[in-house]
Amino acid sequence: MEWSSPQRFTLNRTSVLRHAPEESGVYGLCSADQWIYIGHSSSVRKALLEYLRGQMPYVLQWQPRHFMFEVLPYKQRIARQKVLVTHYQPTCNRKVNSSTGSS
Protein backbone atom coordinates (compact mmCIF):
# COMPACT_ATOMS: atom_id res chain seq x y z
CA MET A 1 0.00 0.00 0.00
CA GLU A 2 1.46 3.31 -1.10
CA TRP A 3 1.43 6.65 0.70
CA SER A 4 -1.66 8.73 -0.05
CA SER A 5 0.60 11.45 -1.51
CA PRO A 6 3.91 10.61 -3.19
CA GLN A 7 5.45 13.99 -2.33
CA ARG A 8 8.69 13.88 -0.34
CA PHE A 9 10.07 16.86 1.54
CA THR A 10 13.66 17.56 2.53
CA LEU A 11 14.28 16.71 6.18
CA ASN A 12 15.52 19.98 7.66
CA ARG A 13 14.07 22.48 10.10
CA THR A 14 12.90 24.99 7.49
CA SER A 15 11.14 22.33 5.42
CA VAL A 16 9.52 20.72 8.48
CA LEU A 17 8.20 24.08 9.69
CA ARG A 18 6.90 24.91 6.21
CA HIS A 19 5.35 21.57 5.23
CA ALA A 20 4.74 19.29 8.24
CA PRO A 21 1.36 19.71 9.89
CA GLU A 22 0.81 20.16 13.60
CA GLU A 23 -2.04 17.67 13.32
CA SER A 24 -2.09 13.99 14.19
CA GLY A 25 -0.79 11.57 11.60
CA VAL A 26 1.81 9.14 10.34
CA TYR A 27 5.19 10.11 8.93
CA GLY A 28 8.03 8.36 7.22
CA LEU A 29 11.75 9.09 7.07
CA CYS A 30 13.77 7.89 4.12
CA SER A 31 17.03 8.25 2.25
CA ALA A 32 17.23 8.24 -1.54
CA ASP A 33 16.91 4.46 -1.72
CA GLN A 34 15.54 3.09 1.56
CA TRP A 35 12.87 3.60 4.19
CA ILE A 36 14.43 4.27 7.57
CA TYR A 37 11.53 4.79 9.97
CA ILE A 38 7.74 5.13 9.90
CA GLY A 39 6.06 6.51 13.00
CA HIS A 40 2.91 8.22 14.22
CA SER A 41 2.34 11.20 16.47
CA SER A 42 -0.29 13.58 17.76
CA SER A 43 1.78 16.26 15.98
CA VAL A 44 3.72 15.29 12.87
CA ARG A 45 5.69 18.54 13.01
CA LYS A 46 6.68 18.08 16.65
CA ALA A 47 7.85 14.50 16.03
CA LEU A 48 9.99 15.53 13.06
CA LEU A 49 11.54 18.44 14.95
CA GLU A 50 12.45 16.02 17.76
CA TYR A 51 14.36 13.86 15.25
CA LEU A 52 16.23 16.92 14.03
CA ARG A 53 17.19 17.72 17.64
CA GLY A 54 18.73 14.27 17.98
CA GLN A 55 16.01 12.70 20.14
CA MET A 56 16.31 9.34 18.35
CA PRO A 57 19.98 8.87 17.41
CA TYR A 58 19.46 5.27 16.25
CA VAL A 59 17.26 6.68 13.47
CA LEU A 60 19.56 9.57 12.59
CA GLN A 61 22.56 7.25 12.20
CA TRP A 62 20.89 6.06 8.95
CA GLN A 63 20.95 9.66 7.71
CA PRO A 64 17.35 10.21 6.60
CA ARG A 65 17.11 12.94 3.97
CA HIS A 66 13.38 13.16 3.29
CA PHE A 67 10.04 12.87 5.04
CA MET A 68 6.47 12.11 4.02
CA PHE A 69 3.28 12.26 6.04
CA GLU A 70 -0.46 11.65 6.12
CA VAL A 71 -2.81 13.54 8.45
CA LEU A 72 -4.99 11.03 10.33
CA PRO A 73 -6.86 10.85 13.65
CA TYR A 74 -5.46 8.71 16.47
CA LYS A 75 -7.07 5.32 15.79
CA GLN A 76 -6.55 5.56 12.06
CA ARG A 77 -2.93 6.66 12.36
CA ILE A 78 -1.98 3.62 14.47
CA ALA A 79 -3.55 1.22 11.99
CA ARG A 80 -2.04 3.08 9.03
CA GLN A 81 1.44 3.00 10.57
CA LYS A 82 1.20 -0.78 10.91
CA VAL A 83 0.15 -1.14 7.27
CA LEU A 84 2.97 1.11 6.04
CA VAL A 85 5.60 -0.63 8.20
CA THR A 86 4.48 -4.03 6.92
CA HIS A 87 4.61 -2.80 3.33
CA TYR A 88 7.91 -0.86 3.41
CA GLN A 89 9.83 -2.72 6.18
CA PRO A 90 11.80 0.37 7.36
CA THR A 91 15.22 -0.40 8.82
CA CYS A 92 14.64 1.16 12.24
CA ASN A 93 11.13 -0.20 12.72
CA ARG A 94 12.59 -3.70 12.40
CA LYS A 95 15.24 -2.85 15.01
CA VAL A 96 12.66 -1.32 17.37
CA ASN A 97 10.28 -4.26 16.96
CA SER A 98 12.96 -6.88 17.53
CA SER A 99 14.49 -5.15 20.55
CA THR A 100 11.27 -4.17 22.33
CA GLY A 101 8.82 -6.74 21.07
CA SER A 102 6.30 -4.04 20.17
CA SER A 103 5.41 -1.97 17.17
Predicted regions and their residues:
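GIY-YIG nuclease catalytic motif and its immediate N-terminal context
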Residues: 1-46, 50, 70-86, 103
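Basic nucleic-acid-binding interfaces
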Residues: 58-74
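Eukaryotic N-terminal accessory cofactor-binding modules
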Residues: 93-95
